[in-house]
Amino acid sequence: MRPKKTILCVDDNEQILSVRTFLLETRGYRVIAVDNPHHALETISTSLPGTLDLLLCDLIMPQMDGNELVRRAKEIHPGLPAMIISGTVTGYDRAGRADAFLPKGACSPAEVLERVRILVARKRGPRKMSLSARNPSLMTAAATA
């Protein structure tokens, strides 16, 4: 059985945080849900590199916006993929350091899950090739033997 992928989900709105957590957990993800960006940074800074598979956060939050959270998170763990979901979308917001940006309300839960799947897979990297795919001469040698 494959280990569950871990998503750090950050939103100051408890109801939205609860819905996202439920959505992700029912699809097999392990979710660490936090309600403010400072707790998120604390979680990121105390986690070992590679233990978090995705940062999923809101754009507009008190104390620190999503772009700033993503910027600081990537200073700590540069390989951590990040996705921002927000109802407030401007050209500047989309120019942030997040790997994906989805407009809240304009995307379905299925679309959110697909983006999550893609970002987690991208972090993992390409699947390892089988021995025969890495060395085709082994395959032809086995076929002629």
Task: Give residue ranges: language-model regions.
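Charged docking surfaces used in two-component/phosphorelay signaling
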Residues: S18-T26
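C-terminal output helix
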Residues: G105-V120, R124, K128
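Active-site residues of response regulator receiver
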Residues: D58
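Receiver (REC) domain active-site loop signature in two-component systems and cognate sites
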Residues: M61
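Acidic, metal-coordinating helix/loop segments flanking the phosphotransfer/catalytic sites
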Residues: A33-L54
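Hydrophobic/aromatic residues positioned on beta-strands within the core alpha/beta folds
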Residues: I85-S86, K104
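CheY-like receiver
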Residues: A121-A145
